[in-house]
Structure formats: C-alpha cells, structure tokens
Amino acid sequence: QDPIYTMVDVACNSDLVLMQKHMPEPLTDYLKRYDDHPQLNSTMATKYPGLLKLDVNHFNKPPRVRVSLMPQKYSNILEPKMQDIASRILDVNRLKKLGWEVHLNYSPLVFYPGWKEEYNDLFSEVNAYAGINKCEVIALTNHRNQMAKASPKAQELMRRSYELKNKSGVMRYPLIHKTR
C-alpha cells in the first residue's frame, strides 16, 4: 500500500529482473511510463536483486522493488536455484543507493515446526545487514498447479501450511517480531 500512488505490479507474477534481457524495451523505458504518471507508480518482486543494476536516482519518484525472503533451508526446497537469501539481504542497501524504494517480501510464509525461531533469526539477519525496511508478509496459499509442479519436499511444506488455515482462509499465527 502506498499513501500517494496506486502501485501497479508491472511484473504480473513473473520476475522482471530475471527477464529484463528478454524484454522488447529497456527496463528503464518500461518503468519511466509510471514515473511520469501523476497517480501510478511501479512495483515488482524479485528473487534476483543481484541482477538489478539500474540506477533510478534520476526518476521523479522511486519505483518499488520487493525483495523476496524466507529462511535459506526452505528457500532451497521451495525456490531451488534462486539467488541465496544472504546475498539478497546484502543487496538491499545497494538497491537503495541506486534510488529504489525497497520493500522486503516475506513470501511465501510457510508454517512448519520451528518456523517462528527461524523467522526470528532471519529478521535479526535483516536488521544486522539491511537495517530498517518496509515489508509485507504473505502466507502461502494453496495453488494446485504449483503444488503439482513442486518437489515432494516442497509439496509437504505447502500441504502443512495449507492445513493450518481455518475455514475462512485466515492464518491464525500472528507475527510478533517485525523488521520495523
């Protein structure tokens, strides 16, 4: 949520940072459309912040990038071959220096035995290396198509998280610690 602009997810559930070399136009031109708009601004999520080299300090308003985070051992299962979590955290301050508005995207939040302790460790690591950041937390939702493509370990994690939902679909595990 943004107090001034309507945020448009320009990546449409894909990773534009990863796909930027395949785009028909430079990422700068694509984002500039929203920079010049009086009511809209752009946002996109990535699991590859290390590939984002674009300096946007010359923009009128900073585009938002949401850096996806979760404990590394579950990242290895749920998002194999992605940029490792520690280096994503280290990229946060570099992106800020390039003019990006950085949000941390704790997504998907997966519930498993010991999840609170592991997320507390992750929050401590973020605070130590990336400082204070805005964030969003998105609980894992059950997408049959995604589960069918996932490894057996990932399917088990997703199934366990899905079973913790009540009938309204609301998770009953509030986060006590936040990254400020």
Model-flagged regions — what are they?
Residues S124-R180:
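Auxiliary Fe-S-binding modules of radical SAM enzymes
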Residues Q20-P24, K116, R180:
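Generic detection of long, well-ordered alpha-helical segments
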Residues S87-A148:
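Conserved C-terminal portion of the radical SAM core fold
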Residues Q1-D91, E101-N105, E136-L140:
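Core AdoMet radical
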Residues L52, V110-Y112, R159, E163:
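Generic, ordered loop/turn and secondary-structure boundary motif
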Residues D29-R33, R94, E125, R180:
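Amphipathic alpha-helical segments that form well-ordered structural scaffolds
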Residues N60-S68, R94-N105, D121-A128, Q155-K167:
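A short, terminal or domain-edge coil/loop segment
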